[in-house]
Structures are given as structure tokens and as C-alpha cells.
Amino acid sequence: MRIFKSVDEKLKEIGFNKICEDKYGAQYERYNTKYNYWQRVDIWHKASGRHILQSYDRDLIDEKKIGNTCVGLTGYEMKLFLKKMKKLGLYSKAAGIEG
């Protein structure tokens, strides 16, 4: 008998279904029935080492067709996704853009 639930199990409990996962990241989706949209959360590896976590409406793209609309995460959701980043080895403390 297991005592603790995995991060993926906890994310599933709050509606996030894992779409894919590999060494370069993971992707999750959940449907918001109140506002009728799909929220997607991506954890992606970047060659720079500044790996990213982004949450957005998967179907809504901006007028210039260069990006999606951001969807916020609660503190609990962010905590779970940060744990997932750490599990994948994609959590880094590097911040900002060098230049």
C-alpha cells in the first residue's frame, strides 16, 4: 500500500491530464467548463539552461499569430508543476535574460 501520491496523481485530481512526457519536458491539459477552454501547461527544456514552465489557452492565439494567451496558475498548481520540473531535472535557478 502506498502512502504518498505521485505528482501526476495529484495533478490528475485537480483536472490535469498528462499528454506527453520525455527527457525534454512534459505537457498537461485540462478543460475549464466554466469558461469553455482548454488550458495547457508545458514544461520544456531549453538549451540555455533556463528551462520554462508556461500555462496558456491552447486554442486562443494572439492577433499577430505569434503567441497564446496566458492562463494563471494557483499557488498549489504552481507548487505541483515545480515539483514535476525538479523530478524531470529541468528546475534551474537561472533567472532573466542575459544581454
Question: For the regions a protein language model found, what residue spans apply to each?
Answer:
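Amphipathic alpha-helical segments
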Residues: 2-20
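Intrinsically disordered, low-complexity regulatory regions enriched in serine/threonine/proline
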Residues: 2-6, 24-40, 44-99
